[in-house]
Curated annotation (Swiss-Prot):
EC number, UniProt record: 2.7.11.22, 2.7.11.23
Listed Pfam families: Pkinase (PF00069)
SUPFAM superfamilies: Protein kinase-like (PK-like)
Name of the protein this chain belongs to: Serine/threonine-protein kinase bur1
Domain Protein kinase: 40-341
Length: 559
């Protein structure tokens, strides 16, 4: 039974939140609850990043290998990260062979001598030997067509389950697909996932229409569909299916196929692949916020020519996954029934797939060291390959999310493929898992209906939240919930947490007084983070200086 069916109670009255949660509990034995970190023997570090650290560990009770994901709170005043809360909530509800399973939570209490007051929280999941991005980066790995079909089938089965239960993943990419040496693929990283309202996909009906608005600041740029690049907010499961198309093409080519350096460049690459939009191929695209300033020259797509060597059945499935019209884009149910999976060679069984050496962050560095040991290439590049330009050096690889890394894509995959631009897509997106040294994304363009004379306030309706109201509240005095997505994803870089909004507003106020240089270097410490016992009083009437009672008395006497 799906979440929607349980919520509606089979046509009866709406269920309360508690009844809804109780109806979707997994078997009591499947989620242990909380244990101590001492119950695990830590074996090694798999990766680290903004969200936390991931370690390989062994349970002292069962002997099973697990992955421990340490959840880092960059600013304890902000509380537990909302991305972690949402991920834990969803993973506790979900149970499918192709969805990463949350076994339990583990707690590490700081010693009494430690100044930290809050315990450290770990998510405990089954250990997976690889992620798909890491396998593609391993020069010793070569995917066969039955292997590609096997992985794609499992991905579609997992998405079919998620969408049938009203879950949008919203970050579909190769780095978030974990694979073990038994050939099992599991969807991971639910930090951006959420429950969605509307109809679930039906056979032969595409992805349908959205029912409410959500933030468009989701999905890593190289896997982001054109409707999100044009700031559609009422989107559907079609955004995940576009990501499936990107992953499918990546397995075929051995590298990401749409490597945009900005949102505008990403759209141009989409138009190159699928053709420029029209009312026939993408109805209503002109009404999207990003479609009103569209000025690209009309051109046909090159998808069929680009993937010609893979055959007409592959091209047929890719065209369905890369449809510009999100309403008619193929859903997971129909994709599973596509002739591609019934055409020889047939998909391999997971147990028949070969095993590979581990492909995590530190293993990628090993792959890079192997390449570094090669003799210098001639000026034009290694024979059979072009020169490598704009190299970013070793990639850090781990995003801090469920994927243990996704990193360091070199696009060579055993030397079979031509080179491509190395390095992450700069600009406006979430921190991708294959690169941690990223900055905050630039703000998306202002909405077309903005006619103000001053700078736009980027903290309210700009991110799918209702505009701020005065003391009178919303018009009409209604207090009901607004039909918007209240979740704003985190875009933290791998380093200190960004300044809070109150700092930004204070700086803006100081700027208006003309007395503050916005680019001045801030102190290396943060007064707010100091221990309360050493925090200075906030009502000091004068600058800190040596007190001299006699001098002060003489000064007042002269007045």
């Amino acid at each position: 039974m799906s979440i929607d069916e349980a919520k509606e109670g089979g046509g009866g009255p709406a269920m309360s939140p508690r009844a809804f949660a109780l109806a979707h509990q997994r078997d009591r034995g499947s989620f242990v609850g909380c244990s101590r970190i001492a119950d695990y023997e830590v074996l090694g570090k798999l990766g680290e990043g903004t969200f936390g650290e991931v370690h390989r560990a062994r349970s002292r009770k069962t002997g099973a290998l697990v992955a421990l994901k340490k959840i880092i709170m960059h600013n304890e005043r902000d509380g537990f990260p909302i991305t972690a809360l949402r991920e834990i909530k969803l993973l506790k509800l979900l149970s499918h062979k192709n969805v990463l399973r949350l076994e339990e939570m583990a707690i590490e209490h700081p010693p009494r001598t430690d100044k930290r007051t809050r315990p450290i929280v770990y998510m405990v999941t089954p250990y997976m030997d690889h992620d798909l991005s890491g396998l593609l980066d391993n020069p010793s790995v070569r995917f066969t067509e039955p292997q590609v079909k096997c992985y794609l089938l499992q991905l579609l089965e997992g998405l079919k389950y998620l969408h049938a239960n009203h879950i949008l993943h919203r970050d579909m990419k190769a780095a978030n697909l974990l694979i073990n040496n038994k050939g099992v693929l599991q969807i991971a990283d639910f930090g951006l996932a959420r429950h969605y309202e509307g109809d679930i996909p039906q056979p032969g009906k595409g992805s349908g229409e959205g029912k409410r608005d959500y933030t468009s600041l989701v999905v890593t740029r190289w896997y982001r569909p054109p409707e999100l690049l044009m700031h559609l907010k009422r989107y559907t499961t079609a955004i995940d299916m576009w990501g499936v198309g990107c992953v499918f093409a990546e397995m075929l080519e051995g590298k990401p196929v749409l490597q945009g350096e900005s949102d505008l460049h990403q759209l141009e690459l989409v138009w190159d692949l699928c053709g420029t939009p029209s009312e026939e191929t993408m109805p209503g695209w002109r009404t999207l916020p990003g479609g009103q300033a569209f000025s690209s020259k009309p051109r046909p797509g090159n998808l069929a020519r680009r993937f010609e060597k893979h055959g007409p059945v592959v091209i047929s499935l890719l065209k369905e996954l890369f449809k510009l019209d999100w309403r008619s884009r193929i859903n997971a149910i129909d994709a599973l029934n596509h002739p591609y999976f019934r055409t020889a060679p047939l998909p391999a069984l997971p147990g028949d797939l070969p095993t590979f050496e581990e492909s995590h962050e530190f293993d990628r560095r090993k792959f890079q060291d192997r390449k570094a040991a090669l003799p210098p290439a001639p000026k034009g590049g290694t024979v059979g390959r072009g020169a490598v330009v704009n190299s970013q050096g070793p990639d850090t690889g781990f995003s801090g999310r469920d994927g243990y890394g996704g990193g360091g894509r070199n696009g060579a995959n055993g030397g079979r493929y031509p080179p491509y631009h190395r390095g992450p897509p700069p600009g406006d997106e979430r921190v991708p898992s294959w690169h941690s040294a990223r900055g905050l994304p630039p703000r998306p363009p202002m909405p077309a209906d903005y006619h103000g004379s001053g700078p736009m306030d980027h903290t309210d309706g700009y991110r799918d939240r209702p505009p701020r109201r005065g003391p009178g509240g919303p018009p009409g005095g209604g207090g009901g919930p607004s039909n918007v997505d209240t979740y704003i994803p985190s875009y933290d870089r791998d380093g200190p947490a960004p300044r809070r909004e109150d700092w930004r507003r204070r700086d803006d106020w100081d700027d208006r007084r003309g007395g503050v240089d916005r680019d001045r270097r801030r102190p290396e410490y943060d007064v707010r983070s100091r221990d309360s016992r050493t925090r200075s009083r906030t009502r000091s009437r004068s600058p800190v200086r040596d007190r001299d009672r006699g001098r002060d008395r003489d000064a007042y006497a002269r007045r």
